[in-house]
Regions:
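Class I S-adenosyl-L-methionine-dependent methyltransferase catalytic core
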Residues: 1-183
Length: 183
């Protein structure tokens, strides 16, 4: 199987009872169900990401504050070590949150695999803050992909849970024609 040095993932986190991703479960605090299939954190953790990650690899993975702890567990299970927030997206239009603070941001965490993964970074002046209005539900700004390539160069890369085909990227997901079989 092809090995990637960049893995960019936007898991379809479930806001239901996390023991499963049953769409018939009640959502938290009246949140609407998303217009796509969701996955429980255990299902996300069990994806065979180790089989597609190169010896030295950098993972960019989206999470919300609600799923932050689960995302850190996913990172570890996939064989990576959390390093920092890669990108913070200020949606400039909405404030979400079901428990305490109302947040209009999402985080894209950066994690590494391999003792030389840090050598994959080619530029050190890429801004982490993305300020762009939200469009389609859960669609992340295209600018993030551009900044990842600017940061790391034109190396083998894949977007997991992709919604669109992007030039230079392999993709996997149920909303696109996938370049690999991951399940």
């Amino acid at each position: 199987m092809k090995k990637y040095r960049i893995i960019y993932a936007d898991p379809p986190w479930s806001y239901y009872n996390d023991s499963n991703a049953n769409p018939d479960c009640t959502t938290i605090k009246g949140m609407r169900r998303p217009p796509y299939n969701v996955m429980g954190s255990k299902e996300i953790m069990n994806l065979p990401i180790k089989s597609i990650s190169a010896k030295n690899c950098i993972l960019f993975i989206w999470t919300t504050d609600y799923h932050l702890q689960k995302c850190l567990e996913v990172i570890k299970k996939w064989g990576f070590e959390y390093k920092t927030v890669g990108f913070a997206w200020n949606k400039k239009c909405c404030f979400m949150g079901a428990y305490t603070m109302k947040s209009g941001i999402e985080l894209c965490l950066l994690a590494t695999k391999g003792k030389d993964a840090h050598k994959l970074v080619k530029k050190h002046n890429i801004r982490a803050l993305i300020e762009e209005k939200r469009t389609k539900h859960s669609k992340k700004p295209d600018e993030v992909r551009k900044r990842i390539v600017e940061l790391m160069g034109d190396i083998p890369r894949i977007e997991l849970f992709a919604r669109q085909k992007t030039e230079g990227w392999d993709v996997w997901g149920n909303e696109v024609e996938s370049d690999i079989n991951l399940t």
